[in-house]
């Protein structure tokens, strides 16, 4: 029976179809939008069909593998495959990118290039999550940089060039460490160089080399995740980017770092991860508090939401460092949960700023009366972000808590201190989110302006918000919807660990 290369189709289709955008009429913005929307919807439908009919939930091994010889000299293969760890981020990518394309409807300047870059990002992200070859993983990682840089520098705010340059310097710097790690891991082997994930997973390294490789990969992933102190590109980037780009950055780009940390550092370098995991837990705990306090001091609405993202990433780092089934499943759930919530907050924040022509919170006030729909949606997603029970964030954070408490890796006193500090972080979250809502939506400040007529959200904004809100509620009520995808894979990853 001949096997159809579904994964190759899913990875290549967006960028291949995106190339034909340049043959569309230069002034036909409407045609470009609908064409891009059609590509994204078709891709999402193919993805859903393939995973529904070809993916087996109870199989922790790699499924739907595509393996083609690409460059003979390097023994370089186009090798793709998915398992319980990668299926969630791939579906999240498809969902958020489709909605980000709809969110980018108002973009009219150079719309052909704008939409092509979004589709190029789409291919790069899915390629990274489904890659089963170290060099292919690196190539897909790099494929992200140029589209994001151009989207920032051409369609950003006043300081777009500064933030785009800062983004490229940070991420390209991290990529150097990733390349060194990939080459070091690929070239070390008794039977010659190998880049195959399956071979690398069974490879044993001297402890010193393993720690060096782990540290190199950690720096690369810490920039993308981001982990403090390598996070300073994120608020500037989010503060200047168009809100559709912010949706892709917050919803998917940050998750690439977390995915890499689990896929490469945890799965392939288990001895080094066992040594580094206490430090990850400490850094994650500090990050929750630090980013929450910094967020509280931000005047810029987008920067406040950006720092809230950094704070929420702390839970993923703690879950990865907990070395428990519950903790790691909680980290993966938080990864997906924040993908939805972060994208929605940036979308609503961006549309609000576009309407009132302000970005500073202390200049806003009283928007809830002229814009009740935006107020309702923004409040709902803020509640989801502060982990209100019944929403996805609550289950994810609770699982990370339980994971660190039940971990056999740490002493009881250590666990109590970490849990207390995390609890303080959870108390700080509603403080900065509710103060943001108060400054934006309450009071009478904007009614004193001469032209104080604002348009509430239209059908497009309402549709995007509801589409994101439904999975947030669904995961909050029935988290097994997502956990069932990764639970067997998590069990397999953690079977390599021993406690020191």
From Swiss-Prot:
Keyword Transmembrane in record: yes
Lipid bilayer topology: Multi-pass membrane protein
GO (cellular component) term, any one: chloroplast thylakoid membrane
GO BP annotation list: ATP synthesis coupled electron transport; electron transport coupled proton transport
Keyword terms: Chloroplast, Membrane, NAD, NADP, Plastid, Plastoquinone, Quinone, Thylakoid, Translocase, Transmembrane, Transmembrane helix
Pfam families: Proton_antipo_M
EC number: 7.1.1.-
GO molecular function: NADH dehydrogenase (ubiquinone) activity; ubiquinone binding
Coiled coil ranges: none
Compartments in which it is found: Plastid, Chloroplast thylakoid membrane
Parts of the chain that traverse the membrane: 4-24, 35-55, 87-107, 113-130, 134-154, 167-187, 208-228, 242-262, 274-294, 305-325, 330-350, 386-406, 416-436, 463-483
Family: Belongs to the complex I subunit 4 family.
PANTHER family to which the protein is assigned, alphabetical: NAD(P)H-QUINONE OXIDOREDUCTASE CHAIN 4, CHLOROPLASTIC, NADH-UBIQUINONE OXIDOREDUCTASE CHAIN 4
Protein name: NAD(P)H-quinone oxidoreductase chain 4, chloroplastic
Organism (species): Lemna minor
Lineage: Eukaryota, Viridiplantae, Streptophyta, Embryophyta, Tracheophyta
């Amino acid at each position: 029976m001949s096997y159809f290369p579904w994964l190759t189709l899913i990875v290549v289709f967006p960028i291949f179809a995106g190339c034909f955008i340049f043959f569309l009429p230069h002034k036909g913005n409407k045609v470009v939008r609908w064409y891009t929307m059609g590509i994204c919807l078709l891709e999402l439908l193919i993805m859903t069909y393939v995973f529904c009919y070809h993916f087996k939930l109870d199989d922790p091994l790699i499924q739907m593998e595509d393996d083609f010889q690409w460059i003979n000299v390097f023994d370089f293969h186009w090798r793709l495959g998915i398992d319980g760890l990668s299926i969630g981020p791939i579906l999240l990518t498809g969902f958020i990118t489709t909605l980000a394309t709809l969110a980018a409807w108002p973009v009219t300047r150079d719309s052909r290039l704008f939409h092509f870059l979004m589709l190029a990002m789409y291919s790069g992200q899915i390629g990274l999550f489904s890659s089963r070859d170290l060099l292919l993983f690196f190539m897909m990682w790099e494929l992200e940089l140029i589209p994001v840089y151009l989207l920032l520098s051409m369609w950003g705010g006043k300081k777009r060039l500064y933030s785009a340059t800062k983004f490229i310097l940070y991420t390209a710097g991290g990529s150097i460490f990733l390349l060194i790690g990939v080459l070091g891991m690929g070239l070390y082997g008794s039977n010659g160089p190998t880049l195959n994930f399956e071979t690398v997973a069974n490879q044993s390294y001297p402890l010193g080399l393993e720690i060096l490789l782990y540290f190199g990969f950690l720096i690369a992933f810490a920039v993308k995740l981001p982990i403090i102190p390598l996070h300073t590109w994120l608020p500037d980037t989010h503060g200047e980017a168009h809100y559709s780009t912010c949706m892709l950055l917050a919803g998917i780009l940050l998750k690439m770092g977390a995915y890499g940390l689990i896929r490469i550092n945890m799965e392939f370098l288990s001895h080094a991860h066992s040594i580094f995991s206490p430090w990850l837990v400490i850094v994650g705990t500090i990050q929750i508090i630090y980013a929450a306090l910094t967020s509280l001091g931000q005047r810029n609405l987008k920067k406040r939401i950006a720092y809230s993202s950094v704070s929420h990433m702390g839970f993923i780092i703690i879950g990865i460092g907990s070395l428990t089934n519950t903790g790691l499943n909680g980290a993966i759930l938080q990864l997906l949960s924040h993908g939805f919530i972060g994208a929605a907050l940036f979308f609503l924040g961006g549309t609000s700023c576009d309407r009132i022509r302000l970005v500073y919170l202390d200049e806003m006030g009283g928007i809830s009366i002229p814009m009740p729909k935006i107020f309702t949606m923004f409040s709902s997603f803020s509640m989801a972000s502060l982990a209100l029970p019944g929403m996805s964030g609550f289950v994810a954070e609770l699982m990370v808590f339980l994971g660190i408490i039940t971990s056999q890796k740490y002493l009881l006193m250590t666990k109590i201190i970490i849990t207390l500090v995390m609890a303080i972080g959870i108390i700080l979250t509603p403080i900065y989110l509710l103060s943001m809502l108060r400054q934006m939506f309450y009071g009478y400040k904007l009614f004193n302006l001469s032209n104080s007529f604002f348009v509430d959200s239209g059908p497009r904004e309402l549709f995007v918000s509801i589409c994101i809100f439904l999975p947030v509620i669904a995961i909050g009520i029935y988290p097994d919807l997502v956990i069932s995808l990764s639970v067997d894979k998590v069990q397999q990853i953690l079977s390599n660990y021993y406690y020191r």
